[in-house]
Amino acid sequence: MSTEWNFKEQGTIDTDGGKIWFGAIGNQDSAKTPLIAIHGGPGMSHSYLYPLSDLADERLVIFYDQLDAGRSDRPNNSQNWNLPRFLRELDDLRKALDLHRVAIFGNSWGGTIAAAYASSNPKGLERLILSSPLLSTELWLADNQSHRDNLPSELISVMQRCEEESQEASQEYQDAVDVFY
């Protein structure tokens, strides 16, 4: 795996609320279906999905940053933080890049977007790959609580105290959260 992105094309695309950044890497002339990679967050960037660039030897791989993330505009408008807008963002990306057929990879929150997009039965979606998607907030909260309950009691105490005192930015809390993750 190379350590450089080597985008063949990158730019911004207009979408509801601002401009989103994209970068395309790989073989644009490949007969294999182009892959769109959707990052988690919301608020993270595409950069941690770098290992997917290994697929660029055989197909076009498109990375993008959702609005308010990475290299995209950051209007910081809570009206933008809704699933239908994120779905339109994905449609805008496909239209702007003229992607008639695609495979979609979604990780975490990106998996939520990808699953919702797939459920709308969009034309040309050939493959869907979900990695640790959030498909049920209720189940996610229960899983997180179960994981937290299994931490050492001293870490649970630190986290509870810091949360009650609104000290989530403290180093003590951050150290406890690092163990959680």
Predicted regions and their residues:
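Conserved HGGG/HGGXW glycine-rich cap/lid loop of the alpha/beta-hydrolase fold
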Residues: 14-75, 79
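Conserved hydrolase catalytic core segment
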Residues: 100-143
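Alpha/beta-hydrolase
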Residues: 160-181
